[in-house]
Amino acid sequence: KTGWKTIYGLRRALQIELGIENTSDSFGPTTYNLCPNINQGATGNLVYIVQGGLYCKGYNPNGFDGVYGNGAYSAVKSLKADMGFPNASGNMNRDIMKALLDMSAFTLLPGGTSEIREIQQKLNYDYYDYYQISPCNGLYDREMNKMLIYGLQKEMGIPKSSATGSWGPTTISKCPTLNLGDSNNFVKLVRYATVCNGYSVNVNTSI
């Protein structure tokens, strides 16, 4: 059974492969910045780490052999689709790797709903670049709430370096007034938040 100790081991293995001398349990900025793209056809220890992470996440790469073949490519492609990127390739990049080497779930968990999971996928697709790839487990929690605020801050034009995912003075001052008939991404985010608060609305429109 996968636990944090296994995830920490995979993170440290990645750091060793990246040449980081002082390894740690975290997937921090140095690990993120040094993490390369790993593409189909690659071989070696980095591929072992990808394959191990996929097995831990419940995706079958069809082998633990250090070869980024069709099995690994297909598994990563399925993982990306579950994250909210249905048309992405099956190659690995640092954003996907960070989410892979984590305990976050990207399939529906007990107690979750398909409506919330769909919103989580949409938030990842539109706003992960302002934060990170977040769970798509169907559960409305603190992480999802933070992602909603990051999305709002991106739409407000707050620079990524200043975005916090928290509801502070700058976010309050820039928050727009919405009126009946408005159609924009702010309305879309309001619809997402409305579903999170237990109301049934169509999230596939921005009106």
Residue ranges and their predicted role:
Residues 1-207:
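Cell-envelope/ECM-targeting effectors and their regulatory/trafficking segments
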